[in-house]
Regions:
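Contiguous, small/hydrophobic- and glycine-enriched helical/loop subdomains that border
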Residues: 117, 139, 143-180, 184-187
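Conserved, helical-rich catalytic subdomain that frames metal- and/or nucleotide-binding sites
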Residues: 175, 180-276
C-alpha cells in the first residue's frame, strides 16, 4: 500500500493526497482516510539510551488489515473539542485523550493554530495488542484526515515529523508499502520490492503489551548491551526478487525470545507454523 489518501465528502470537495498541500479552509463536511497495519519482517533492537528508548533497525511491510478514520466537522456547541467514537464498541480501545488518534488531532491543531475541533469515527480491523501498530495507523490517519478537513496543508515531511512525536510506529503508515525504519523506527526509508505476499497471522485472545516485551528484552539481554544489526542483504534481495520462500528464511525478530518468555505457549504456535 502506498501513502495515505484523504477522501473528502461535500459539494466541491476534491480528492486530497497526503503529500500535497490543500487550501486553508476545506469545504468538505467530513474526510475519510484508510491506514494499514504492518508486519515487521526484521527487527534488531539495541540497548536503551539515556532517554529510555531503544535504537533499532526494522523492515516494515504494510498489510491489508485496514483502519478507517473519518473526521467530521463539529456543530457549533461542540466547537473546539476532539471526540472519538468507535464504529464497533471495543472495551480494549479507549476513546478518551489516551487514544493516539485523539492525540494526533490535538497535536495538529496545536502545531497549526487551528481553533476548531473534530469528531473522529474509527473503524478498527487491525488486532489490538498484536504488534501490528493499529493505534499508530489510527494516529496517522487522523493526521491526514484533519489536515484535509481543516485545510492546514502540511506536506508529508511535516506530517511525518508530527507523527514521530506521537510514537515511533506512527510515521510508517504515512508512506506504507515496505520500508526500513531506523532510529527509534521513526526514520522511514522506502525500499524496492516485487510481487505480493500472503501472510498468515495467528491471533491470541490476549495480546502482549509492547512496553512489557521491551522490559523483558532488557532483562534477558542484561549487561550485554546488544548492538543494532543492519538489515540482512538476503532479506532485501528476497524482496527485490519477489521470492517469498527466501523472504521467509530471512525473517528475524529480536523481541521473539522476550515474547516467548512472557507467553511460552506461543512456542507451539511457531512450531506448527514452521512445520506447515
Amino acid at each position: 500500500m502506498s501513502h495515505l489518501r484523504a477522501v473528502p465528502s461535500g459539494p466541491t470537495a476534491p480528492s486530497c493526497d497526503s503529500s500535497s498541500a490543500s487550501p486553508r479552509s476545506g469545504s468538505a463536511s467530513s474526510v475519510r482516510v484508510e491506514a494499514p497495519g504492518k508486519v515487521n519482517l526484521f527487527l534488531s533492537v539495541g540497548a536503551p539510551g539515556p532517554d529510555g528508548y531503544h535504537p533499532l533497525t526494522t523492515v516494515f511491510q504494510a498489510v491489508r488489515l485496514i483502519e478507517t478514520v473519518t473526521a467530521r466537522r463539529q456543530s457549533a456547541q461542540d466547537h473546539g473539542t476532539v471526540t472519538l467514537t468507535l464504529e464497533e464498541p471495543d472495551a480494549d480501545v479507549p476513546t478518551d485523550a489516551s487514544n493516539l488518534a485523539v492525540q494526533a488531532a490535538k497535536l495538529l491543531a496545536e502545531a497549526t493554530g487551528v481553533g476548531e475541533g473534530v469528531d473522529l469515527l474509527l473503524r478498527k480491523r487491525v488486532p489490538v495488542a498484536g504488534g501490528m501498530a493499529g493505534g499508530s495507523a489510527d494516529a496517522a490517519a487522523a493526521l491526514v484526515a484533519c489536515n484535509a478537513l481543516w485545510g492546514t496543508g502540511l506536506p508529508l515531511p511535516e506530517l511525518s515529523a508530527l507523527a514521530a512525536r506521537l510514537g515511533a510506529d506512527v510515521p510508517f503508515p504515512l508512506t506504507g508499502a515496505t520500508a526500513v525504519g531506523s532510529g527509534r523506527g521513526d526514520l522511514v526509508t522506502p525500499i524496492m520490492t516485487r510481487g505480493s505476499y500472503h501472510w498468515v497471522f495467528a491471533l491470541a485472545e490476549d495480546g502482549l503489551s509492547t512496553p512489557a516485551v521491551f522490559r523483558r528484552f532488557d532483562e534477558l539481554t542484561g549487561a550485554g548491551e546488544p548492538a543494532v544489526r543492519d538489515v540482512p542483504e538476503a532479506l532485501t534481495a528476497a524482496l527485490r526478487a519477489g521470492d517469498a520462500r527466501a523472504l521467509a528464511d530471512s525473517l528475524d525478530n529480536d523481541l521473539q525470545a522476550a515474547a516467548l518468555d512472557l507467553r511460552p505457549e506461543l512456542a507451539e504456535v511457531i512450531a506448527v507454523a514452521e512445520e506447515a
